[in-house]
Amino acid sequence: AYKLIYQEKKSIRLAEGMTLTSRLLTEEAQQRALNCLAVYSHIIEVQKIKKVLAVATAAVRNAINGASFLKRVRMSTGIPMTIISGKAEAALGFAGVSHTIDQKDFLLFDLGGASVEISLVKNKKRIHSISIPIGAVTLTEMFQSSREVNQDKIETIQRFIQNVLSKVEWFPSEPLPVIGIGGTVRNLAKIHQRAVNYPLPKLHNYRFPVEDVFEEVRMITGKSYEERQKINGLSSERADIIIAGALVIQEILRKAKATHLTISGCGLREGLFFHYYDPI
């Protein structure tokens, strides 16, 4: 058995400022990450941790200067970090979910800042997976949707997402349960919990109807940046990237013909631990 004794999480937005043409991690984003990892390095030292598992995902994977950034991480913090493939990222997200949610057949998505991983699971086995390089941060930057957006802009983003998803040929033809991982999906769940006065402060395995998700997306996209910052349940620091992220989730749910969305509070980080502790 294992026991969780401490956890810490920080949103860095490593992909911020990285364009499809330049594909460079900006100095500002790198510095934010290095500052955060310096704190984690101190925690590792104080707690006398012997084994450290550290991986870098889409932002570093897609960046031309990703490898040199990881050298900086190693030199300044001592943390050895490995870039993982989109396939490995999908596998670890699945491990985080499969160990903590009892569901046999489902569609799983993990929406991050620079990519979304989608997996089709049958009888608790991943039969298809894909990593698509569109995330809440990169889409926001691509369409400049961080502040006010009009209906034309929303429809342009939707068409772009639909076009990307149309290339995934193995989407289930029959409706399947859909499980979501990531900060955007957790925020949508928090907004829903506040709206229905949900009595528990628990997001993991929280389930709500897709009609409510779509209603939330309509509400979010209809508000100004300042108004979004005041939405009950939405982290104010996510108010600028929530539109792009919410539209990705909406289009995945539509394509999957889903009736409900289930939230997993466990994802890649937990999957990394389970893969080490109990490989499947």
Regions found by a protein language model. Name each.
Residues A1-I5, K125-I127:
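Beta-strand initiation motifs
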Residues E8-I12:
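A structural signal for short, well-ordered beta-strand segments
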Residues R13, G17-Q47, T57-D105, L120-N123, ...:
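Helical "lid/coupling" subdomains associated with nucleotide-phosphate turnover
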Residues K50:
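Conserved strand-helix element at the start of the C-terminal RecA-like helicase core
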Residues A54:
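Dinucleotide-binding Rossmann-like beta1-alpha1 core, especially the glycine-rich loop
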Residues D105-S119:
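A generic, well-ordered mixed alpha/beta core segment in the N-terminal half of proteins
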